Curated annotation (Swiss-Prot):
S-adenosyl-L-methionine binds at residue 268. Belongs to the class V-like SAM-binding methyltransferase superfamily. GO terms for molecular function: methyltransferase activity. The keyword S-adenosyl-L-methionine applies. GO terms for biological process: methylation. Keywords: Methyltransferase, S-adenosyl-L-methionine, Transferase. PROSITE patterns: SET (PS50280). This is SET domain-containing protein 9. InterPro entries: SET_dom, SET_dom_sf, SETD9. Its EC number is 2.1.1.-. Gene3D superfamilies: SET domain.
Length: 273
């Protein structure tokens, strides 16, 4: 493997090529969550809505009407919308919520926990955010002392560090790809106010002898048909602009039912080179 200085890499082992959940199910979950987030933020989406086809606008208005059937006044609807936090939307949509907290492992720092509900086996429980690098792209300086670099099977790297030069690079790419009010990715995972509640996968700790893995990493390429108005919730962006290649994402999938209060543990290898 090419040296990465003092950096460490997480990666999907070769024997994990078989996907726990189909790409269709992963896509379905992301669309379901992102659409719910979009509807929850509907009164903030006016600029984006003006750029969408009438058929798409009508679809969201119909969905919103169904969601708020019992609400007669527009003001009340907006007031009701503003009461839901992203993690509450996640719970309403998938039946569980996850969040960062101090890990149950000594000296492990942050971890990710199921804060409410039950995660069923096979469910997408979080996403691994960050800048996506092709294997030929420069990442040496970003990798120094960086424990948040994830290596995919094909050598694609995802830098999930929310600090330092990694943060600067992500913000720069995020601004580069923006089309007026249309954001091609979500940068709020770099802040304390996360809009996509799934974007906490970089803080999932490795399993240990007494803490078996309950989630696994799974690669997912965003299809070309992904709704442009929902890309604002994707917590990944390509280092180099390339409209022809699909965006690589990595999701974490439950290996078993995971109960409220449990910490998520993955199975990754750390390589120091």
């Amino acid at each position: 493997m090419v040296g990465f200085g003092l950096g460490t890499l997480r990666y999907v082992p070769e024997e994990s090529k078989d996907k726990v959940t189909s790409d269709e199910d992963v896509l379905g979950t992301l669309l379901k969550v992102f659409q719910a987030l979009f509807l929850n933020d509907f009164n903030k989406q006016s600029e984006i809505l003006t750029m969408l086809p009438e058929s798409v606008k009508s679809k969201y208005q119909d969905l919103l009407a169904v969601e708020h059937q019992g609400v007669k006044l527009l003001e009340n609807r907006h007031q009701q919308q503003s009461t839901f936090k992203p993690e509450e939307i996640l719970y309403k949509t998938l039946g569980f919520s996850v969040a960062q907290a101090t890990s149950s492992l000594i000296s492990a720092g942050k971890g990710v926990f199921v804060t409410k509900g039950l995660v069923p086996k096979g469910a997408v429980v979080s996403m691994y955010p960050g800048t996506v690098y092709q294997k030929y792209e420069p990442i040496f300086f970003q990798s120094i002392g960086n424990p948040f670099i994830f290596r995919c099977l094909d050598g694609v790297l995802i830098d999930g560090n929310d600090k330092g030069i990694s943060k600067v690079v992500y913000r720069s790419c995020n601004g580069r790809d923006r089309l007026g009010p249309l954001k091609m990715s979500d940068s709020t995972w770099l802040t304390s106010e996360i809009h996509n509640p799934l974007a906490v996968g970089q803080y999932v700790n490795n399993c240990s002898n007494d803490r078996a893995a309950n989630v696994c990493y799974q690669e997912f390429d965003v299809p070309a048909v992904f709704p442009i108005e929902l890309k604002q919730y994707l917590p990944n962006i390509a280092y180099s602009y390339d409209k022809h290649s699909p965006l690589r994402c990595v999701v974490l999938v439950a290996l078993r039912d995971i109960n409220q209060g449990e910490e998520l543990f993955s199975n990754y290898y750390t390589i120091v080179s």
